Regions:
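Polytopic transmembrane helical bundles with strong interfacial aromatic enrichment
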Residues: 1-123
Length: 123
């Protein structure tokens, strides 16, 4: 029988991603208020935090509650957090417009993460 338990690094990375979602949410609300308001990017930051935290929860589910750890689902979800949320965070603070095309790639990665769960077989 194949061992489908998540690797230790995946559990640790999930914890770090979740913690950073909370940290960045608090930082946006309390440390970057003026910058985000000046740039008119409060909603961009809030969108990044929302998707970051939703997908941190998905990573917890993937690593702890599924009967079969899906490396592909985990990979797509993690890539989505970094590309989608990361590009929005940077866009909100620095207004780097060239990051705009990266955001949808992260969004597609999120979609693929959810769709790859269709392949997970229950035992």
């Amino acid at each position: 029988m194949k061992n489908n338990k998540p690797p230790n690094w995946a559990i640790k990375l999930t914890a770090i991603i979740g913690a950073f979602g909370i940290i960045l949410g608090a930082f946006g609300a309390h440390g970057l208020e003026e910058v985000l308001e000046k740039n008119g990017n409060e909603s961009v930051w809030k969108t990044a935090v929302f998707y970051h935290l939703i997908h941190a929860v998905l990573l917890v589910v993937i690593t702890h509650n599924l009967r079969a750890f899906s490396k592909l689902t985990y990979l797509f979800c993690t890539i989505g957090v970094f590309l989608f949320c990361g590009s929005l965070y940077l866009l909100a603070i620095f207004e780097l417009k060239w990051l705009g095309p990266i955001t949808p790639i992260g969004g597609v990665s999120f979609i693929l993460a959810w769709l790859t769960m269709l392949k997970i077989k229950s035992t």
